[in-house]
Amino acid sequence: MARVYYERLSDECADYLENESSRRREHTAMILIFDSGPFATQEGGVDFEKIREIVNARLPELPRLRAKLRRVPLDGHPVWVDDQEFNLDFHLRQSSLPRPGSHEQLCRTASRIAATRLDRSRPLWDCWVLEGLEGGRFAMILKMHKALAHLEGADLLQTLLSADEDAPLPKATRALVRPAPSPVELFGEEVIRRWSPSRRAVGRAMRFWESPARATRLVQKRAQNVLRALGYQIRPAGESPFDGNLSPHRSYAVQEVDLDQVQKIRQTIGGTVHDAVLTILTGALRRFVEGLKISPTTVDLRAVTPILDATGETAEAWVIELPVWEASGEVRQELLGEQTRRIRSEQDLASAESLASGDTWTAARLFAIGARALKRIENGQLAVLQSPGPQQPLYLNGAKLEECYGILPLQD
């Protein structure tokens, strides 16, 4: 008889589940726009069944996408178990925009999808295929819970997209479904687990102190983070036009900026693309505040921005003060540059170039890692997350990826 399988969620992931409410969501979403390519039909739509066939063929490579939640009896802690009754039709769905669907109509549809809570009784993801977009294109909106999206074996986009325009259609294989424990078995396994942490803790402590240099670096890093956090707690964020309580509704919009223009700004002011984006954002926010008939000199705006470390596997949320009160664009750039240079000097950070230089595009996973760092933004009012785009054309079995956008969960 096969051994039962389950995986206990980390305390951090369990917190994401507990923090959700009728107004607060803990999932991220990606919007991808493709040319119809080989999926185009004579009626002007897309061949949804062919897309379904491709996704279904890739699922055996992504066991995480078949995992659903269970609760440990009495304890209540969530665990992952394989869904014995997994049905792709509950996760891959088809809809249509009124032709020719505009960007604005796509954003309204994405807003409704982002506002809807994922079904806790099933694996925590879904994907919408929207046909009817102007130019004969179609869109995919992939929504995934933060407790799932960062895990290995859950990056659906990395599996679906390829640099090979003529990639062959994968053949579907039978997925391995591992037996889930009964409530009694799950409770028994957790009782055993609770008796073993003391032995594991001793082993971790011995490994930690066997490397004094590593121990010193970790202690210094924790001390820096504590001091920084205390500093911001002493001086909390002031009032801003973005203060207020969350509603159950969402409104999503897209503003495109040519990357070449951003690069020119970066070359002029120095620093990184991220610095240039912050400079552009600060100027735009100053004009926005002025449009509300509010003096920018009275506004204290801070952005919480996740910074990926050099491995690209973890991120910390840093608070950047956006000097909207400063009228001079050059001075705003200098003030922002001082902050970002200090951050980079204190931590080994990943560059956008290094994160995007691999053979596969992992934007969805990097986006999820960054979103996880945005637990709460009480020290700021805005979130700014940089996730590099693909450095080469990507295709969904011949359909070219033309545009991609991310949706972060709102925090209060």
Residue ranges and their predicted role:
Residues 11-23:
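Acidic, low-complexity proline/glycine-rich segments
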